[in-house]
């Protein structure tokens, strides 16, 4: 049986992208909206296209994604991560180019927690000698 839908998840900070790839013409739908409509001016289109261009599958798959959490910039990065992992499901031979481009690696940087007895994660309360 040939699979016609490929699923993967991508993450960045607190953003989670659930991504489905189906054979198509290259449309990208995010939370039932077009990407330019959902992301607005901060839209980083090149990040979403990079996994497809790396694997020579540009405009061969339609993307349907649901995004939750985080800000818009983190959501774009999570979407690119999810697309990369879904492309890996379509063809295991995509692993080498995606890995060389660094698209399969999850960005582990997250906000550092606030510590008690301090103003923030690193900032201290003002110190007075007298």
Curated annotation (Swiss-Prot):
Keywords: Ribonucleoprotein, Ribosomal protein. Residues 109-130 are annotated as: Disordered. The keyword Ribosomal protein applies. One of its GO terms (molecular function) is structural constituent of ribosome. It holds the Pfam family Ribosomal_S9. It comes from the Bacteria. GO terms for biological process: translation. One of its GO terms (cellular component) is cytosolic small ribosomal subunit. PROSITE patterns: RIBOSOMAL_S9. HAMAP family: Ribosomal_uS9_B (MF_00532_B). PANTHER family: RIBOSOMAL PROTEIN S9, SMALL RIBOSOMAL SUBUNIT PROTEIN US9M. Belongs to the universal ribosomal protein uS9 family. This is Small ribosomal subunit protein uS9. It comes from Desulfotalea psychrophila (strain LSv54 / DSM 12343). The gene is rpsI.
């Amino acid at each position: 049986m040939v699979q016609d839908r490929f699923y993967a998840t991508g993450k960045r900070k607190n953003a989670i992208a659930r991504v489905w790839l189906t054979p198509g013409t290259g449309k990208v739908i995010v939370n039932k909206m077009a990407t330019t409509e959902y992301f607005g001016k901060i839209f980083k289109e090149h990040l979403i296209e990079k996994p497809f261009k790396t694997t020579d599958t540009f405009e061969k798959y339609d993307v349907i994604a649901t995004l939750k959490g985080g800000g818009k910039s983190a959501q774009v990065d999570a979407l690119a991560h999810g697309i990369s992992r879904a492309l890996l499901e379509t063809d295991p031979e995509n692993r080498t180019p995606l890995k060389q481009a660094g698209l399969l690696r999850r960005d582990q940087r997250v906000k550092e927690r606030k510590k008690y007895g301090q103003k923030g994660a690193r900032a201290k309360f003002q110190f007075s000698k007298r």
